[in-house]
Design a protein with these regions (language model features):
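Acidic/histidine-rich helix-loop elements
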Residues: 42-53, 101-107, 136, 219-223, ...
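Bacterial N-terminal signal peptides
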Residues: 11-26
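Acidic (Asp/Glu)-rich catalytic clusters
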Residues: 58-62, 79-91, 114-124, 151-154, ...
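Active-site gating/metal-coordination segments in enzymes
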Residues: 32, 78-161, 214-217, 223-224
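Hydrophobic faces of well-ordered beta-strands that scaffold small-molecule active sites
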Residues: 38-42, 69-71, 92-95, 128-129, ...
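N-terminal secretory signal peptides that target proteins for export/translocation
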Residues: 1-10
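An N-terminally biased module of ancient metal coordination in phosphate/nucleic-acid-related enzymes
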Residues: 26-88
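H/E-rich (His + Asp/Glu) clusters that bind or coordinate divalent metals
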Residues: 183, 191-306
């Protein structure tokens, strides 16, 4: 069978953002022809399930040869629903948002710890997260529910996907330093932080890995320049810490607005676009570094066999 591969560069205007260059990668290629990808950060939330099913999501990731996918759900159990649709590819993490309304008050609900322990003890979940902490907003880092989740990560030896929003790395540093036994996956590498702010965390906390989801031009926009070239600081960081960087799509729209009650989240409609963005900047790295960040780092981090 004839297989047509395209690797063209086009310039496009997208949603009012600046002119960007993208590669159209393998539009007509079969999934087996595309390099395997580990998407370390996706969601299956109640406001996504309204417009896309678990089976439709699995079809999307298979088509793009995403071999490993870490999912958290709101409510938490939706991660298990997506996992059930493809247990080989989907790795569920326990989200502290156990109901559709838990995002704002999870840290006041002791049921979070009960459900987390039950899910980890029975090996339903392979990790904890995504959990959000905002500097200057509740909860404080000494909150009993937050600390209890950290205790469970230590007890069951599972990774912890943590999202922090702060002006610099000093908000997260005490957390990773106080829990050296926990393997932290730092969501979005701190979001708005520059590479030179992220590097001290990697240097001082060898239990931290970073993932670069949502650092695309439509959300945090802090990874590449207007021509889609990887910024020098990130290029240097990836080359200096090639074993501790991963990436993912985080198909939530928009990542900074949170969930809405008046409209469904169509983030999965952007999945292919987000994935292509990450493949494009990864292609700028040395081949051995590209392969680690694209796939094998996640495989080792999660103890996945395939």
């Amino acid at each position: 069978m004839l297989r047509l591969h395209l690797n063209l560069c086009v310039k496009v205007w997208i949603s009012g953002f600046s002119l960007l260059t993208f590669s159209i990668y393998g539009i007509f290629a079969h999934a087996a022809d595309i390099k395997p990808f580990a998407d370390i950060h996706v969601h299956f939330n109640w406001d996504q399930k309204e417009i896309i099913s678990a089976q439709q999501i699995v079809a999307k990731i298979k088509k793009q040869n995403v071999a490993i996918t870490v999912v958290s759900g709101t409510p938490s159990a939706l991660a298990l629903e997506l996992h059930a649709a493809d247990p080989k590819r989907i790795i569920p993490f326990f989200s502290p948002y156990i109901t559709a309304a838990s995002r704002k008050n999870w840290y006041l609900d002791k049921n979070v710890l009960l459900q987390a322990e039950q899910g980890l003890a029975t090996k339903q979940y392979a990790g904890i997260g995504e959990l959000h902490l905002w500097a200057g907003m509740p909860p404080r880092t000494d909150n009993p529910v937050f600390q209890g989740l950290l205790d469970l990560a230590e007890k069951y030896h599972v990774p912890f996907l943590i999202h922090t929003e702060a002006a610099d790395q000093r908000f997260f540093l005490p957390i990773c330093q106080s829990r050296p036994q926990i393997r932290f996956l730092w969501a979005h590498a701190g979001g708005t932080l520059a590479a030179d702010q992220v590097k001290p965390v990697l240097k001082q906390c060898n239990n931290v890995w970073v993932e670069l989801s949502a650092r695309d031009p439509w959300r945090y926009n802090t990874l590449v320049d207007d021509n889609n070239n990887l910024l020098p600081g990130w290029l240097a960081l990836c080359n200096e810490y090639p074993d501790r960087v991963m990436t993912g799509t985080d198909p939530v729209w928009s990542v900074r607005k949170g969930q809405r009650w008046d409209a469904a989240d169509d983030g999965w409609d952007h999945f292919e676009q987000l994935l292509e963005f990450h493949r494009s900047w990864l292609a700028q790295l040395p081949p051995n570094v590209e392969e680690k960040i694209r796939f094998s780092n996640a495989k080792r981090f999660l103890f996945a066999e395939n």
